[in-house]
């Protein structure tokens, strides 16, 4: 685990974005942890979040021309990541996002920001069922751009309804790499360093054993 990944876990814990306990997911599964990126909700949170996303992008080595944030959660993520890449990595890249409903006045169209072209890096909070990615792919393909990759904050590394995860389905269906700031494996590595969190470690390991990919 890299220093920025450990820092991201601590940031998420401090903001109660990441919690350990017993939680029932939408799928009906009982999970020993819960991650709610919507609680990154202040100016400072967003500034820090952008730096973690930018760090993960640079670390990945994936080449791309533009950041795309799917509405709605992806919009602030794309914006703050673009700022962080420019400020901390000297990479001044365009970004854009979609509207849920197209406008018929003003700028018009369903996109806001830069023209959607070239190699697109899609940024979002998490992938649950992959629906937002599929909707975004329709937009990207309609503009004759290509999907360079997808970056999310957390990869739960667990099976969907079939034998593979929603993330693996996206990689298979679109031939792109999905990267994340942290994974379930990183969470386990972090818990292993914290003797006072041993009870959570056992529960998360058991969950991975049952649902992991």
Swiss-Prot record:
Source species of the chain: Salmonella typhi
Chain positions recorded as orotate binding sites: 34-35, 128, 156
Family from the record: Belongs to the purine/pyrimidine phosphoribosyltransferase family. PyrE subfamily.
Catalytic activity annotation: orotidine 5'-phosphate + diphosphate = orotate + 5-phospho-alpha-D-ribose 1-diphosphate
PANTHER family the record matches: OROTATE PHOSPHORIBOSYLTRANSFERASE 1-RELATED
Coiled coil regions, renumbered to chain: none
EC number(s) from the headed UniProt entry: 2.4.2.10
Protein name listed in UniProt: Orotate phosphoribosyltransferase
Binding site for 5-phospho-alpha-D-ribose 1-diphosphate: 26, 72-73, 99-100, 103, 105, 124-132
Swiss-Prot/TrEMBL keywords: Glycosyltransferase, Magnesium, Pyrimidine biosynthesis, Transferase
Root EC class: transferase
A Pfam family per the record: Pribosyltran
Domain of life: Bacteria
Subunit comment: Homodimer.
């Amino acid at each position: 685990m890299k220093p920025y990944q450990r820092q991201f876990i601590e940031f998420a814990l401090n903001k109660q974005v990441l919690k350990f306990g017993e939680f029932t997911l939408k799928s009906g599964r009982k999970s020993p942890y819960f991650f709610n990126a919507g609680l990154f909700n202040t100016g400072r949170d967003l500034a820090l979040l952008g730096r973690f996303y930018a760090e993960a992008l640079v670390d990945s080595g994936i080449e791309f021309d533009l950041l795309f944030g799917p509405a709605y959660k992806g919009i602030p993520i794309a914006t703050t990541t673009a700022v962080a890449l420019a400020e901390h990595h000297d990479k001044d890249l365009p970004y854009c996002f979609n509207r849920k409903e197209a406008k018929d006045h003003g700028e018009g169209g369903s996109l806001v920001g830069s023209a959607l072209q070239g190699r697109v890096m899609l940024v979002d909070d998490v992938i649950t069922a992959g629906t937002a990615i599929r909707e975004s792919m329709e937009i990207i393909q309609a503009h004759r751009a290509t999907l360079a990759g997808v970056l999310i904050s957390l990869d739960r590394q667990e099976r969907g309804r079939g034998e593979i995860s929603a993330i693996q389905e996206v990689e298979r269906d679109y031939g792109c790499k999905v990267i994340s700031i942290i994974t379930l494996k990183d969470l386990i590595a972090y818990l292993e360093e914290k003797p006072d969190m041993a009870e959570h470690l056992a529960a998360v390991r058991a969950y991975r054993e049952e649902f992991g990919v």
